[in-house]
Amino acid sequence: MKKTLFLALPAIALLAACSKGNEQPQQAQAGPTFHDVMKDQIDKHADEVWDVTNPAVGDKGGLDPSKMTDEMWKQLAEDATAVEEGAQQISQMDKIVVIRPGETIADAGVPGGHSAAEVQAEIDRNPQGLRDHAANLAATMRDLVAAANAKDAAKAGPIIDSLDGVCEGCHLDYWYPDQKALVEKIIRENK
């Protein structure tokens, strides 16, 4: 009996060692996740782009340069730069990880919203498409930075007007793709 137990102990230890590796929690993302960059950099500063420019919309639409102060132009350039940098970071991510284990995303549990796992599955289906959306956003913001630095309302206005569409295109592909057909129908009906 002692001899059998003595021989069985190494096999049990080996089996336990192999099993233990499978029970370890998933290693945390080493750097910012997709959600980190979206929440803390892109969304935050895109909202600030609109906050700075909405009061300067002219009576006939577009950006009215007489309503833009030097400080507003400076703030616009800074916020557009922050969005550009965040978008550039996402466009260069090797492995795009939505969140770290145990975290949640905005709109999870909200009707029409998706869980992090659902968003991750959409990204995993076409990660290059997400990188391309991010690169497009970065290029759009680069143009806005140049227009803001030049205090050129004629160039900045249309870029700001297009920003919602640039963002929404990516959101419809990755964040809430089941609403894409509805949005496209509404757009067609309102043309």
Question: Where would I find each of the regions flagged by the language model?
Answer:
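C-terminal active-site/capping subdomain that shapes the small-molecule cofactor and substrate pocket
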Residues: A11
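Bacterial N-terminal signal peptides that target proteins for export
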Residues: M1-A8
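Sequence context surrounding c-type heme c attachment/ligation sites in exported
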Residues: S19-M68, W73-A77, T81, Q88-K191
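Charged/polar interaction segments and conserved charged motifs
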Residues: M1, V83-G86
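C-terminal motif of bacterial Sec signal peptides marking the signal peptidase cleavage site
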Residues: L14-A17
